[in-house]
Amino acid sequence: KAPAGGYPFYETEAKYDNIILLSNNGLQGAGKIDFIHSTSQTLPSSLFAFLPDSTVGIVDFVNRPHEQAVEFPPVKSDEAYISYVPKEDVLRVRSLPTKELEFFDGESNLRGGIEIRPEGMRGKGLMDLSRATLISDDFSFKRWDIDADTASFDLKNENPADNEEDPLVFNTDNVTAHVSFKDRLGEFNSNQGESKVNFPVNQYYCLMDKFKWYMDNAEIDMERASGKDITIDQGVDLKGPNFYSTHPKQDSLQFMAPKARFNVRKKVIYCDEVEYIDIADARISPDSMKVVIRKRAKIDKFQNATILANYITKYHKFDQAEVEIKARRDYKASGRYPY
């Protein structure tokens, strides 16, 4: 049994105040380790193992939230693996295959590990945010926030129509991430100018610079700020497309939309500021500059649209047109032809 005041711990100021057992399994003991704002308590069926440079064990782990100076989030697990390295001033905590680390009072769970130091808490792995997942090799945690310089972000399909519908409705990689559980907002920026965003259920992908995820509204705003005008030989100024259909029957239908909003529950993409879509030899301009994309790449009909045919010579112009776009070279329309 430890003397009053405890045993010196690895030649540091830390003390161990409990029973130490010496056997063929080495030095072992039961009790708890208090480190910064965390407590690691051995389970009834487990013991700490005292190694030459560290203490390891399966514990009931709690990290209490702290909002002043260096911030720490609330984390807990009733069964986690810890490694305490006093001379490095670090406590490492890792989830078990059957037990994730619970963050932010149940708002998210981490399948991976964290490091607690006086400078703060970092980690890596997969964060399950209930409706979304965030994957990174280097998370930084604060009282209410998750940050990552490089991350992948997915939004789950919460209400699939059938077993064949994709389990994800939104996916992007290589973005910076800032998620605030206080503001109920996630903000993401591309690390490479533009990031590819996949919409598996809509059978589309787009290229965008930045995104904002409104957690409670289940919506995400997207913006493309880096699009440049491209001049082709015929002298027509075109903006490079950033929305592309992946539907096998639409022949890579594509168009430019610098802004869009995605409704996660409805699985609908609302594209804004769409000047035109080139279909076959026609240039079709929606009067609202809006394009609505539903599941399986279905585009809502345009009302009161303008059609130029062909779009190089602009010889024929139709207005007040109702247009149904079916594929890159296939559309059906009716309208007025002034002459």
Which residues does each predicted region cover?
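Structural signature for solvent-exposed beta-strand/loop edge elements and short helix-capping sites
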Residues: 1-339
